[in-house]
Amino acid sequence: MDINRRDFIKLVGLGSAVFVLGTEFSSEAAEKEFYFVQLSDTHWGFNDAKFNPDSTGTLKKAIAAVNKLEIQPDFVVITGDITHTNDDPKERRKWLGEARDIINGLKVKDVKILPGEHDAALDNGEAYKEYFGKTYFTFDHKGVHFIVIDNVSDPTSSIGDAQFQWLSDELGKLEKDARIVVFMHRPLFDLYPDWDWWTRNGTKAMDLLMPYKNVTVFYGHIHQENHHNTGHIAHHSAKSLIYQLPAPGSLPQRVRLPWNPAKPYEGLGFRSVQAKIKKAEYLIREFPVMKG
């Protein structure tokens, strides 16, 4: 689906729905529910003006835009690729530290961060954990159980056995109608494996999630919006904050799309997600980099 062609999209699974809106998050809704902001694929350290001449400024602009939101979110989640790949362990840590310092500029101090393969695949997440902590974890917020999955630290694009056992144990604590939101970097389903847009053993994770009626997944990695349902499980990818990538399979190869001087920051942005807990619905609004 192309959300740019419609002001309103409703994706309905058997137990969850997502509305993609072009309206503001209301103060009335804020009193009843909650919302969070999702940033993704900031790639701090990337430096190629052909694809983004403002590579050191785009993340800062996004942080400023979030800080200008009239109603501040309950928390912010950053779904991976905080930094760009760097083979030098010392330089990699420098970039992780710089990115952390910029992220600390958010007014909202409850920030959930998870790795992307650019952050973690070269050393199984060791440097990442020095700066941001655990690569997978859970938390609860106002009636929603959030699960953060690490499908990037293993360089084979897989989820490890220990994490599967952990996931099974965590899900075993929940009722089948629990409100569950899952964050990860890669798509859990086979979006386009030829471009590494998948999780090699993602089907196993979905088999664990499938018995639960209300599951929604938010991820990054593909640098664009994509909305997909696996049965009743809805999957929603976020835009990048550094450069665009083509639609899945639209070009012979996965290549970065050049910066458009006539439309600076085109295709880049972040989103807010309003949780309507009783109905297990999530209202999404997309923001450009320059606006809050």
Specify the residue positions occupied by each region the protein language model found:
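Extended active-site neighborhood of metal-dependent phosphoesterases/phosphodiesterases
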Residues: 88-179, 199-216, 228-239, 243-283
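N-terminal export signals
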Residues: 1, 7-27
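Short acidic, glycine-rich surface-loop motifs adjacent to enzyme active sites
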Residues: 175-191
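N-terminal active-site segment of His-dependent metallophosphoesterases
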Residues: 11, 24-93, 191
